[in-house]
């Protein structure tokens, strides 16, 4: 499953995604990972959620992020959920390219059984919007 929330900056995407990760980790029988472009959630996420900063791995394109996410799935057979915040900042993509990226990740999800959750900045959406791919 691939789902994402979108909205303008400051509408609460990060907080919503972090809360979803915490709730998921409480009920998950496997591992949960939170990917972000900063360490700002270091003290907000519990220790059973692994926080990964994309800056540490020089991830700056859709190809890099896709390969990184595939590597996470390949290296951890107990991985159930991956949460990715600041997706458009990491990828510097337009909305159209985000849709293409989500389709690729959907194929990864179907092949691995890992659920992916993204926060996407959309300058044209004033409220939080939830979508599944």
Feature map (PLM): residue ranges:
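Conserved P-loop
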Residues: 1-71, 127-129
């Amino acid at each position: 499953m691939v789902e994402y929330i979108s909205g303008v900056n400051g509408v609460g995407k990060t907080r919503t995604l972090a809360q979803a990760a915490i709730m998921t980790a409480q009920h998950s029988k496997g591992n949960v990972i939170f990917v972000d472009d900063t360490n700002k959630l270091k003290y907000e996420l519990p220790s059973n959620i692994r926080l990964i900063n994309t800056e540490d791995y020089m991830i700056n394109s859709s190809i890099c992020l896709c390969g990184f996410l595939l590597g996470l799935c390949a290296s951890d057979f107990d991985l159930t959920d991956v949460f990715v915040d600041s997706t458009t900042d990491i990828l510097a993509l337009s909305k159209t390219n985000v849709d293409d990226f989500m389709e690729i990740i959907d194929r990864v999800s179907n092949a691995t059984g890992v659920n992916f959750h993204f926060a996407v900045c959309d300058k044209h959406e004033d409220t939080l919007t939830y979508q599944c791919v």
